Regions:
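Extracellular loop and loop/strand-boundary signature of outer-membrane beta-barrel proteins
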Residues: 1-2, 37-39, 81-85, 132-137
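Gram-negative outer-membrane beta-barrel transporters
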Residues: 1-43, 48-58
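C-terminal beta-signal and adjacent terminal beta-strands/loops
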Residues: 30-32, 42-49, 54-76, 89-93, ...
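Intrinsic disorder/low-complexity detector
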Residues: 5-10, 97, 116-119
Length: 153
């Protein structure tokens, strides 16, 4: 197989947008004295609240196994063997994003929480062949939360 022949690839994306600004109960809540003190809470309602997800799956990426020569202390690929005869483990990742938008008179404020790799799966990036003849696995990043603020003028 070619270097990027994953076999199967699946990506599912979805989300929903809640428009609370148009609701009368939200307008009353926003004008209340308590709103400025609790609006920073991550899952608190806002003018617009978006919740979205992305799930990615792909079959194992092919690679060519290397052999270790103890005499020369080096790794090599046997030219008599076919290339890309082995595969890494499958790749799977679920990301979730929560976006909150606030509209003010002169600016718009957006806060977001983006959670990457919710399942905390060790997705293999590559095999690392060390000089001493051992093998270690290099993984892509595991769980990673990203927080952010966007200010629009």
């Amino acid at each position: 197989p070619w270097d990027f022949d994953y076999g199967n690839v699946l990506t599912v994306i979805g989300g929903y947008k809640f428009k609370f600004r148009e609701s009368k109960w939200y307008q009353r809540f926003r004008e209340s004295t308590i709103f400025p003190y609790i609006s920073w809470i991550p899952f608190m309602v806002s003018d617009q609240l978006e919740i979205s997800f992305r799930y990615s799956y792909s079959g194992g990426r092919p690679y060519t196994p290397k052999h270790y020569n103890f005499r020369y202390r080096s790794w090599f690929i046997n030219p008599a063997e076919d290339l890309n005869t082995a595969r890494y483990d499958y790749y799977s990742r679920l990301d979730i994003m929560i976006l909150r938008r606030f509209n003010f008179k002169k600016i718009n404020l957006t806060t977001f929480l983006d959670l990457h790799n919710i399942f905390d799966k060790n997705n293999v990036w590559e095999k690392m062949y060390l000089d001493n003849g051992s093998i270690e696995w290099a993984y892509q990043y595991k769980q990673m939360p990203v927080l952010g603020i966007i200010i629009e003028f």
